[in-house]
Amino acid sequence: MPNPDTSTMTPREIVQELDRHIVGQHDAKRAVAIALRNRWRRMQLPEELRNEVMPKNILMIGPTGVGKTEIARRLATLANAPFVKVEATRFTEVGYVGKDVEQIIRDLADTSVKLYREQAKVRVRNQAEERAEDCILDALLPRRATGIGFDPEAARNEPSSQENDTRIKFRRMLRNGELDEREIELEVAVNASMDIMTPPGMEEMGQQLRQMFSNLGSGKSQKRKLTIKAARPLLIEEEAGKLVNEDDVRTAAIKACEQHGIVFIDEIDKVAKRGEAGSNGGDVSREGVQRDLLPLVEGSNVSTKYGTVKTDHILFIASGAFHLAKPSDLIPELQGRFPIRVELTALTKADFVRILTEPKAALIKQYEALLQTEGVSLTFAQDAVDRLAEIAAQVNERQENIGARRLHTVLERLLDVLSYEAPDRDGQSVTVDAAYVDAQLGELVQDPDLSRYIL
């Protein structure tokens, strides 16, 4: 089940958490927060009624770079739920070359199993660490085989007092890191992997073949000489894998996939039929993708290698810029399956100022931390932040509006010289102010032709 600390969060708390990473777009945050809370509400209902309550899927409408994808990604992290992001343009109607839409659910099941397997390994980690220590101690202190019919397992359970004292001493040294550089010889499990190239649309077959060949090679091991420091994580991972019950993991993962899975479909507008385009082959293919998506969103059974997944209660969040098409250009059946529509607003200069400074991992904080690794202390004056936001807004207005992604382009250009010279400026402090910004970017901003190609 999802993390109990986050699954009981109220919509207000979810929005506050999203505010730490994403600037503005309050309506979209409210919509996803309510959708997430409704999942918790549904799980509190009696089973008979619970099965009747369907998720209210969300359609996000807004230009590129305003936070559509980031909201969905942060929401999945927050919910600790199986999450997969796909582009609608990667899929084609059944019968055409391209990915089958059912692959979305198979990918979601894969993600869910990986998530729950890692959680199961965390739960048995302490036990796995003890087993790994025993393996290392056995390599350091081989037990003496004496007598006919010697049983090594019995000897392990009832060691002599002298052996026991020695193991206790070595275990203490091992935990203190005093033996990290000592080499030992171990039998390590071999992962038999094989690269299989498959043509477009046959990725699933390639995946099944890879799994088949890896299963054929499972159980094999090889002797390797490693330092204890390098061997310990390998042994912990191997022992944790032995302790985890794979059947329980798969059962829990499939249930979580069905009840808590989130699918984010980006660029849904690219498979909408353009109203003014007339009826042509491209439109037929696009409509076919929508019709193939429809059973997944409505609720159907999809076969995966872990078992059958029912999609009735999976939350679907679709997004698109809808520059050339309108939401009403989607087929009516699909429109009806996305009852909640949220319009995200284009970003302004004030939004850019906040994006540069407010989020937990704001862009300016990232660049300051990157250059600090070279010993350069970088700081941005407030007038520089204002000027950068103004430049990004101007360029977006004059050219294609790519939202907050414009800030990446502007900052990379601004710090180009400093990033190149950083290794030679160890110990220096650099303050970026409005004058520095104008010196580096002023000419580009004033010349529309230059800014079109460089910014």
Curated annotation (Swiss-Prot):
Subcellular localization, as worded in the UniProt entry: Cytoplasm
Keywords, alphabetical: ATP-binding, Chaperone, Cytoplasm, Nucleotide-binding
Any Gene Ontology biological process: proteolysis involved in protein catabolic process
Primary location group: cytoplasm
Domain of life: Bacteria
One cellular-component annotation, GO: HslUV protease complex
GO MF annotation terms: ATP binding; ATP hydrolysis activity; peptidase activity; proteasome-activating activity
Gene3D superfamilies hit by this protein: 1.10.8.60, P-loop containing nucleotide triphosphate hydrolases
Pfam families: AAA, AAA_2
PANTHER family documented for this protein: ATP-DEPENDENT CLP PROTEASE ATP-BINDING SUBUNIT CLPX-LIKE, MITOCHONDRIAL-RELATED, ATP-DEPENDENT PROTEASE ATPASE SUBUNIT HSLU
Protein family: Belongs to the ClpX chaperone family. HslU subfamily.
Summary of subunit composition and partner proteins: A double ring-shaped homohexamer of HslV is capped on each side by a ring-shaped HslU homohexamer. The assembly of the HslU/HslV complex is dependent on binding of ATP.
Role: ATPase subunit of a proteasome-like degradation complex; this subunit has chaperone activity. The binding of ATP and its subsequent hydrolysis by HslU are essential for unfolding of protein substrates subsequently hydrolyzed by HslV. HslU recognizes the N-terminal part of its protein substrates and unfolds these before they are guided to HslV for hydrolysis.
NCBIfam families in the record: hslU, PRK05201.1
Name of the protein this chain belongs to: ATP-dependent protease ATPase subunit HslU
Organism encoding this protein: Xanthomonas oryzae pv. oryzae (strain KACC10331 / KXO85)
Lineage, highest ranks first: Bacteria, Pseudomonadati, Pseudomonadota, Gammaproteobacteria, Lysobacterales
Gene: hslU
